[in-house]
Amino acid sequence: YAEMYPDACVLLVDTYNVLRHGVPDAIKVFDEVLKPMGKRPKGIRIDSGDIAYLSKKARKMLDEAGYPDCTICASNSLDEYIVRDLILQGARVDSFGIGENMITAKSDPVFGGVYKLAAVREDDGSYTPKMKLSESAEKMTIPCLKKVWRIYDQDGKAMADLITMADEVVETQHGITLFDPIETWKECTYVNCTARCLSTPIYENGKRVYNSPSLDDIKKFCKAQVGTLWDEVKRFENPHRYYVDLSQKLWDTRSTLLKKLSK
């Protein structure tokens, strides 16, 4: 394997015994196969056992053997909680191989996305708002053609999202007051803030008008957007709620339609 992939040689070291056989045998391969070729090892991978403890011992063994640049990868059904705990324990891990828990979330194994009718286009080009009634207020749909705006503070941190009618423009020069669409008595006024429209047309008149970004661009954009969230929102335990509110105009339209349909 090392002879075939000398520039990308990552060896699994936990098949039998990590510290007694795995790491020593990997070092032997590095010495006897890669070194004569003038190549440096890419890394080793630990897929079982006490990864925090084993990675510290493996790091020491690799350093003493003259391979401080050899990385250590950890795998074995990792999720964000295990990764966090490994970091807190000071594990000497350079990268984490996350498989099934990234492609299928334990808490939400099925993405519950459903299309719901929001408006009907009439013959004259106008739109008639539509919504679904439900016994649960949270499950009632939001009618009309809409836009989504993100409100940022003066430091560029995201404070809340605001859903508006498609023809609305969010002005923030004099501050903006948002309220919870369910518990309407809960409101908050933001000053020294800015608003950015998140809605981007993908298709117009049946034709695609959006150029798909590269995977690298998607990754950079996602990382940048997550960086705008407060740490209190991103923490695992008891995170702060990130609010998504409705504009007054949209909330009034929804309430009027709800009263009409409930008669």
Predicted regions and their residues:
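Buried, small/hydrophobic-residue-enriched core segments of structured protein domains
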Residues: 1-68, 78-82, 88, 104, ...
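Gly/Ser/Thr/Ala-enriched C-terminal appendages of enzymes
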Residues: 60-65, 70, 78-263
